[in-house]
Amino acid sequence: MVVTHVSSDRDPWPSMRDETKTTRQFVRFGVASMRGCDSLLVQRWRPDQDSREPDLVDNDRFTFAGSFAVSGKNAAEKGSLVVSRFLFDLATATESSTITFTEYTNLLEGEFKNRLKTRAKPLAIAEALADQAFIALKLPPDLRPSVKCVVVSRSKPVKEGKKARKIRDARLFGNAYPGLLRQLRQDVEDCLVIGGAWDLLTQPSAESDFDAGCDDTVLERLETHRYPSARWPSDFSLSPYQQVAVNELFARTSREGIFSINGPPGTGKTTLVMDVVAEIISRRAEILLRFDNPLDAFKATASGSDHGSTFEIDSALHDFIIAVASSNNGAVNNLTLELPKRSKIGERYGKQLNYLPKLAERILAQHQVTSPAWGSVSVPLGNKQNRDRCASAVAELIDDGCPDDDDLSTRNWGEACAIYRAAKARVDDLKAKHVRLDELARSADEFGSLQKAAGARPPVVTASSARNGSLAMSQAEAMEAASHPIIAASQRQIEEAREELGKVVLPAEFLDADPRARAEMLVGTSTALEDARADLFVAAMALHQSFIAGAWDPISANLRAWTERIAHPETGGSPSSAVHLWSTFSLLVPVVSSTFCSFANVFASLGRDAIPWLIVDEAGQAAAHHAIDALSRAKRTIVIGDPFQLEPISAISSSVDDALASRFGIPREFRSKAGSLQTLADRINPFGARRNGKWIGAPLLVHRRCIEPMFSISNALAYEHSMVLVNNALQAENPVGNDRLAFGPESAWFNVRGASEMPDRFYVPEEGALACYIMSRLAECRPPQHRGQLPDLFVISPFRKVALGIREDLLANAPTMFGHTAPDVVEEWAERSIGTVHSFQGKEAEIVLLVLGASDAESISWALAKPNIMNVAVTRARRRLYVIGNRANWFQDSSRDAWMLGQGRDWLVDEADARALFSRSPHHKPHLRLVV
């Protein structure tokens, strides 16, 4: 993409055509300064406010009245005019004009058509349209800068033997959110149900002195009867805090509602989501059991689609569609492309799970995922390409015919039902045994048995007895109680239960353990029960497979109609029929994902309150007004994120935000720049805790991603030392001997005092040179099995100009740094591995180089004002963190910036010593040139 600002009458079109590419230009006309627009709003809404304050947007940011396309013959294209609402809404908000949007659009379209008839040049058309727009909207002329228009050129390579596809407008003005918000407001005025959006906007604050992470609460929420019947078939159970969150969210969203979970980096948010998905699927299996024959769940409808008849699916099966949404496209894609991987299930379940494998393999292959799949559990649908891909995969499945024995040794319906009932009975039986074990422990406690003084095993106690100190008995009383025949019988039964259940953690054992051990101790369950819950999910998937085979005719008919609907959402269709099609598709693929921006397109045919389960990932990054439409379509919403990681990016200035709040009386928590969807969902969740001055939803506290010092830096920066680092296998895997440079020397701050530091330059070339040197050494010193591969690392900076400078340095030195590695491979790796902190939310690497840059206090203060940016940067690293920068510039506040001092005397390393640390090898040491 090439952007040209046109300030004169000189023709901006390229003089020579590139035959290897097809190119199309779009002319953005009616250019207006965003700074001027901000000032106009502030003056209108809050005239007493100083609109010249420094946080107003930069001078070089513009908005536009609209755009049109220019053909290869340098003529405006008929029918290509797009009119933006921004300037119209600005005029409406400031009461500059009373013209309607329809009248305004018709005016510009008429002018455009008239100019086309006279064969006017594109620049003349742009000026005429701009004049008409500003006159019609009665906007002040000083909004118009010297730039007459902006020309955007977009190109695509021409592939040999294929017809060049027409380049479409990249929706320059296609922000869907204003239209969605207007429709939501209208629905509220019409008294329609708006799902979870109503709770988010109207419920009072639930903040209190309650602490969801305290021992009493954890033990209470881990009582056996609170556990879901099924879990994801992993070799490992959830941590107690994850399990508390899962138990509580199902208890609080039985029919509707919002539940928020606070997940710091590396605390297992994805793992938690997998358990939620497993339980929802297993709950649907309970409904499937009701049908003596799978065909009984379907009823033919009078009307159908262009592809034939459709069927109504029993309404009891409408409640299991799962949608995952986020502002972050990478987050939703990563989640829904991770769940189907065979690596995500435990080894003992590998041969038992093989759910619609052809469909699963097609879905992963469409997204260039080469990992083997266990089943078609999820798919990303968040843009048209993804929807077309999925529709194609489903169409191929229909063409293949009914899933047969080659797919999963499909059992007959009766056998599948019997196996599921047996698995469910096993779970129920083990839960009953746990309840009985708890009752026996209570009885033993009441009689004061199992005292150490009597020589028995350590006491079996409940949480209440441990807290109340009711075990203080004399030795004589203990011996007398232990000899009581009832208590002796209870002890025998307790021992028998332990032998059958396997590993069991009793409340007293949990309370007596140190925090690190406690973080992995699940109370209320056992090895046997965890295995049985996973087996139930396996049986549920087999039941679904058998159900699909038994009702393939109505299912395939509905799938044909679904593929038509999802590929062409503009064709509409009633919500009443859509829910039957979506519920049918959900039998095959239970989880779908989308960004908020595309959510309304994916679920265009479903109305408000129609999606049974919405899971929002990375909610701390999501602006509430972006998410509100998705919430309005959902019955239940699970909001997962972290207010101490990256915050939403807001294009609105603080001045306009303040003026807007003043004009319309907006409470602070609902203001655009005050928080995120996560903070609003946390606000109404009574099951939470206060951390770092903020009320958060159910906290996840067990960290498994990073080793030291990254864990302690993050824990101190953002979480008041509430997280616990456990089972750190990464530490044990550190290379030794000749392979010690595989991950590099210990984490450190490399103190670089750049001779070229300047207040107005963010990039310090000396810092970039050291970063490139380290990258080259890490690439050269990789273990033999990885020699020749580029290292698993990220180069991160708070500032875009620093990231661009490092990328430029690296590409200039690539032959010296990486030997014979192909330039396109290096370029792709650099694009993927070097960027700002905002590029890496949700990602991780073995090594992170945090290159700080900047020398002026104001920029540094911006990066450090909140813990969010540094918290995310530091926790991208699993094994090594190398901070590169001038610590004298960055250390500003002795309490806030204490992490910069490190935990050991070797943390601060001068630049020369840093190079020496990476040079202790007989290999060639490259000499890199600075790119200034």
Please name every model-derived segment.
Residues 181-237, 478, 482-610:
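Conserved helicase NTPase catalytic core signature
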Residues 233-235, 239-397, 568-719:
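ASCE P-loop NTPase helicase motor core
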Residues 780-875, 879, 887-892, 908-911:
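Conserved helicase C-terminal RecA-like lobe
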